[in-house]
């Protein structure tokens, strides 16, 4: 899930996951507002921002997932947010960011309500190459480090209610990791 232009399709096309057969995605599914990406260990559904923004269409998609796989409709949700919404000429105002965040939160809540499961939600910040110095920073990393997550993974149980202090913990952990990596370069 993401906002228009977040780069979900680019992420799915260039993620390095093994594709068992030619043509990882089903372009025919685009007409339905989502594209299915087939990998050797799973399927990813790239939901268009039009469907995410339209509550009725999103509700219908969630219901289809629930009816197709009633015991486990999804394993997780991936929320893709571009850096361009946070920095630079195209950055959003605080009010607009809050509105976008609230809208995406409501969709994730609706999804979990319809499928009757609390699923892990991963947040990917895309378009890092738009950050000044990010490309040079990544070029200096070893191949092994480039394959690792540059971010924070919640140490809390999936069912634990969200706590606002997690954002501070995440920012501190990411900052600490970045400082350590810069010293190694």
Say what each PLM segment does:
Residues 1-185:
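Basic, amphipathic N-terminal segments
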């Amino acid at each position: 899930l993401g906002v228009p232009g977040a780069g979900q399709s680019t992420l799915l096309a260039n993620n390095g996951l093994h594709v068992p057969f030619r043509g990882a995605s089903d372009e025919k599914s685009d007409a339905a507002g989502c594209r299915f990406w087939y990998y050797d260990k799973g399927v990813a559904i790239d939901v268009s921002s039009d469907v995410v923004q339209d509550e009725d269409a999103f509700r219908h998609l969630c219901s289809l997932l629930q009816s197709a796989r009633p015991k486990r409709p999804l394993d997780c949700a991936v929320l893709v947010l571009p850096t361009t919404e946070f920095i630079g000429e195209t950055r959003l105002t605080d009010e607009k960011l809050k509105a976008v965040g609230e809208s995406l939160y409501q969709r994730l809540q609706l999804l979990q309500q319809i499928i009757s499961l609390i699923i892990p939600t991963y947040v990917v910040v895309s378009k890092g190459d738009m950050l000044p110095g990010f490309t040079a920073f990544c070029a200096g990393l070893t191949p092994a480090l480039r394959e690792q997550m540059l971010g924070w993974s919640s140490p809390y149980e999936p069912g634990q209610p969200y706590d606002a202090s997690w954002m501070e913990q995440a920012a501190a952990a990411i900052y600490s990791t970045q400082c350590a990596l810069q010293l190694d370069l």
